[in-house]
Amino acid sequence: MKQESAAPNTPPTSQSPTPSAQFPRNDGDPQALWIFGYGSLVWRPDFAYSDSRVGFVRGYSRRFWQGDTFHRGSDKMPGRVVTLLEDHEGCTWGVAYQVQGEQVSKALKYLNVREAVLGGYDTKEVTFYPQDAPDQPLKALAYVATPQNPGYLGPAPEEAIATQILACRGFSGHNLEYLLRLADFMQLCGPQAQDEHLAAIVDAVGTMLPCFCPTEQALALV
C-alpha cells in the first residue's frame, strides 16, 4: 500500500512547528510528546515513535467531513476523510504515539506536510484516555480540520458520503481503502468502541458496491 506521505512533486512545505511549550507535555517526561491519530494515522503513522497506545478522546465525534484532493481524491473529485467535531457527548477512538528527543521535530515536520500542507488540518490539544489505563489520561496533539479550511466539505447524508468515497482515488490509494481500514481498526478496539457515523457509511458502501463495479472487482477492493 502506498504511504500517506508527500510525493516528489508535492508543493513546497511550510516551516515545521518548533517543539515548545505550545505543544502538550506530560509531567512524566517533559521532553516527550504524544500525538493522537484517529484516521489514517491509526494504521500508517509513517514516523518513528517510542510507544503507542490505543484509547479514546472525549468531547469529540469523528466525521467524514473533510475533503481530500491529494491522498484519497483529486481536485476534480475530492475524497472524504475524517476530522473531529466538538460534541459534548462524543467519544472518538484512535491511537496515541509517543515521540521523544529527535523524534519530536522529525515527526512534526513530516506531519506538517502530510496533515497541514496537503490535508488542511490544524493542531489542537486533546486529552487522551488509554484503553488499558483510562484513569491515567495524557495530553496529546491532534490534527483537526475546521470549517475555515478550504478543503472542508461539511455534513452530508451517509449515503452521499458513501457514494463519494466509492468514486474517489488519490496518491495514497482508493478512498474505500481508507474507510475499510478505519472500520477494521474500530472492530479491533472491541464492542465498547462505537462510531455510528462510520458504521452507517460502511453499511451504505456494502449496499452500493456491487452497483459500482463487477463482483470480482468489488471483492478485490474489499
Swiss-Prot record:
Induction: Induced by chemical activators of the unfolded protein response (UPR) such as tunicamycin, DTT and thapsigargin. GO terms for molecular function: gamma-glutamylcyclotransferase activity; glutathione specific gamma-glutamylcyclotransferase activity; Notch binding. Its main location: cytoplasm. The keyword Cytoplasm applies. The active site is at E115. GO terms for cellular component: cytoplasm; cytosol; trans-Golgi network. It is found in: Cytoplasm, Cytosol; Golgi apparatus, trans-Golgi network. Residues 1-24 are annotated as: Disordered. It holds the Pfam family ChaC. Keywords: Apoptosis, Cytoplasm, Golgi apparatus, Lyase, Neurogenesis, Notch signaling pathway, Unfolded protein response. GO terms for biological process: glutathione biosynthetic process; glutathione catabolic process; intrinsic apoptotic signaling pathway in response to endoplasmic reticulum stress; negative regulation of Notch signaling pathway; negative regulation of protein processing; neurogenesis; Notch signaling pathway; response to unfolded protein. Its EC number is 4.3.2.7. Residues 1-22 have a biased composition (Low complexity). Substrate binds at I35, F36, G37, Y38, G39, S40. It is an enzyme of class 4 (lyase). Belongs to the gamma-glutamylcyclotransferase family. ChaC subfamily. Interacts with NOTCH1 (via extracellular region). Catalyzes the cleavage of glutathione into 5-oxo-L-proline and a Cys-Gly dipeptide. Acts specifically on glutathione, but not on other gamma-glutamyl peptides. Glutathione depletion is an important factor for apoptosis initiation and execution. Acts as a pro-apoptotic component of the unfolded protein response pathway by mediating the pro-apoptotic effects of the ATF4-ATF3-DDIT3/CHOP cascade. This is Glutathione-specific gamma-glutamylcyclotransferase 1. The lineage of its organism: Eukaryota, Metazoa, Chordata, Craniata, Vertebrata. The gene is CHAC1.
